[in-house]
């Protein structure tokens, strides 16, 4: 039996890591917040919190209570649990923790939370608050394992997709109630209204958009633009997510290999 992995976060990048780990036979439990705000929710196992169940690229994720985790894992399903991180640590005692919340800072993950602790993206330092960091910035170092030092700092500039950076990310201009008028996979024209924050229109061409009915803060990310206009991309795990997921899987398998080597030497 492979060691249990606890994944903090169920967004699109975390889901790429969950997919890679599941394909390699690792049992994974996702820890999500009660009201997730992922943009690309069609490719997020954490969307099971809203739907009850989420199917993504052959694997099923299900929103369950902590008491149901063991039975859910036995069914080959990915449990998505909204209990506190501390409660999951105490109850499940995972061998591996992956923090893929992507908040650009460490929200409480500690190196002694598990035998192997992995941080995804900026906000972590390999060999300090986590054992290893996975690079998330697009480019040459994407998906690399960093055992000594931090990931590249957040630049605040979205990665280049289809020739666009700042233009492809849409933020709210005020706090209020967000209501979507367009949906994931819709093709829209530039400046077309895709939704409202209260009565203020939001305009863009989108591949992802927040679930309607959420209260958002000022400058909250509402939508993600993809000028490539490939509808299938809206429903499949992205190249970036899989690259980061590959880095997570490498860190896990390298740790297992080294642990087994140490055991053979005894």
Name each model feature, range by range.
Residues 1-266:
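Well-ordered secondary-structure scaffolds
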